[in-house]
């Protein structure tokens, strides 16, 4: 169906719904690369005007990719909760925005509507929102998950401890891991990106993390971010797997380029559930996403990068994950050119994820050839923390020596917790205090915690 909008006697045409969504998107290099972006700020404003007047029901009547061609579309439509949708079903996209921002809309109202909001509805309304709108609404969308601790409670900010090493050297990983723990990092997950996807190497890393967590009785979970098929094989061997990781995207074709489909994700989740390793809950999937992934696989179907990203959240939502995060600036300036675009994308992703009911975190990051620097990351992580972001990354010095990109450091989480009065997950916070890492006042204790002297001695004197 085509859409038109007139401004000062000039008519603007949009051939279909996905074209209208793309033209209404805030500027980003991914959409320009794909030839989908508005040709001018005037066209962008007109497209946003036209989008604001569309009924939300249009996204159910006109799927962006026909469900008979795409399993992600089928999942989104088949899992849509009509009862949850009823209170907002008469709204236009513009009225939906006003409802989200209204003081009359309670946090309970937002939570009740989650399963009635499709990813495309979330993406559409985000295109009409300023940054402060994205922050204000996301802050009210609390999403709590559990495995060995409780993540996502209001007033909490968790971190993924990311002790990557370019050769997967056990001592190098252990040093970074201990460094992170001494800064209060790791309550979301201790997660390693392996240098290779070799099952033997991944198994060795999983045993290393399991040993550290068990020896020190750390109330957290581990993950080696291997391909889901590798993790499945290792679970069959009896290797200690806490969380199952996989990168996901918003179209069937993009997921196929990752070597996955929905059935494979379901198989992996069932296998992990059968291990019964969670002490507090059974949220055990960990997904990473990022704007531009479908475009980079030539699998975007003419859909803009941000809407494709929101569709990935529809995939994630089906598997009740413990953690989901956008790796916002990782693909590079071809997709998000500069700090301004990275900041906007991070806020959009967090908003859409939280609105859809996901435990949404963010890898606040950029590549060295982007027009961005650490000050931009300071801005984004602060805005996200104000917005109630579930977790960020903890990388030694913010410089990942294996993935060769810039993220956030252990110190960054301490800064955010200090200036905004945020705390780690409650079980992990209690462990930090018990170990003498924290001083009982949500701050680092002075000196080396006596209970970790042995671990430090092992790293300096022998192989961990």
Task: Report residues per predicted region.
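Anaerobic metallocofactor- and corrinoid-dependent redox/one-carbon enzyme cores
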Residues: 2-176, 182, 187-464
């Amino acid at each position: 169906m085509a859409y038109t909008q007139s401004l000062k006697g000039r008519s603007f045409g949009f051939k279909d719904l996905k074209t209208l969504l793309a033209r209404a998107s805030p500027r980003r290099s991914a959409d320009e690369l794909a030839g989908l972006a508005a040709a001018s700020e005037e066209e962008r404003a007109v497209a946003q005007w036209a989008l604001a007047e569309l009924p939300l029901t249009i996204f159910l009547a006109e799927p962006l990719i026909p469900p008979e061609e795409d399993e992600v579309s089928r999942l989104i439509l088949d899992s849509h909760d009509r009862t949850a949708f009823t209170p907002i079903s008469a709204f236009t996209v513009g009225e939906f925005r006003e409802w989200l921002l209204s003081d009359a809309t309670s946090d309970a109202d937002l939570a009740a509507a989650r399963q009635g909001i499709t990813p495309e509805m979330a993406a559409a309304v985000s295109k009409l929102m300023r940054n402060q709108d994205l922050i204000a609404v996301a802050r009210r969308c609390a999403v709590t998950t559990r495995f060995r601790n409780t993540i996502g409670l209001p007033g909490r900010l968790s971190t993924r401890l990311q002790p990557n090493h370019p050769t997967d050297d056990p001592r190098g990983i252990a040093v970074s891991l201990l460094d992170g723990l001494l800064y209060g990092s790791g309550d979301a997950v201790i997660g390693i990106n392996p240098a290779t996807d070799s099952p033997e190497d991944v198994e060795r890393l999983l045993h290393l993390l399991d040993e550290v967590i068990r020896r020190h009785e750390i109330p957290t979970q581990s993950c080696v971010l291997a391909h889901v098929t590798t993790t499945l094989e290792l679970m069959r061997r009896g290797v200690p797997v806490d969380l199952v990781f996989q990168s996901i995207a918003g179209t069937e074709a993009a997921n196929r380029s990752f070597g996955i489909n929905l059935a494979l994700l379901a198989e992996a989740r069932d296998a992990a559930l059968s291990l019964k390793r969670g002490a507090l809950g059974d949220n055990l999937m960990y997904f990473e996403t990022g704007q531009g992934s479908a475009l980079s696989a030539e699998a975007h179907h003419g859909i803009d990068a941000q809407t494709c990203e929101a569709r990935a959240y529809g995939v994630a939502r089906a598997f009740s994950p413990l953690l989901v995060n956008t790796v916002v600036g990782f693909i590079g300036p071809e997709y998000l050119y500069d700090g301004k675009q990275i900041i906007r994308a991070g806020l959009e992703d967090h908003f859409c994820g939280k609105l859809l009911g996901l435990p949404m975190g963010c890898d606040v990051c950029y590549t060295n050839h982007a027009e961005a620097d650490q000050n931009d990351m300071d801005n984004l992580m602060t805005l996200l923390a104000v917005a109630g972001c579930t977790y960020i990354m903890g990388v030694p010095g913010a410089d990942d020596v294996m993935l060769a990109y810039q993220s956030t450091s252990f110190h960054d989480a301490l800064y955010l917790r200090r200036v905004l009065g945020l705390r780690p997950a409650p079980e992990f916070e209690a462990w930090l205090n018990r170990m003498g890492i924290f001083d009982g006042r949500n701050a680092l204790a002075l000196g080396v915690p006596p209970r970790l002297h042995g671990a430090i001695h092992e790293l300096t004197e022998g192989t961990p």
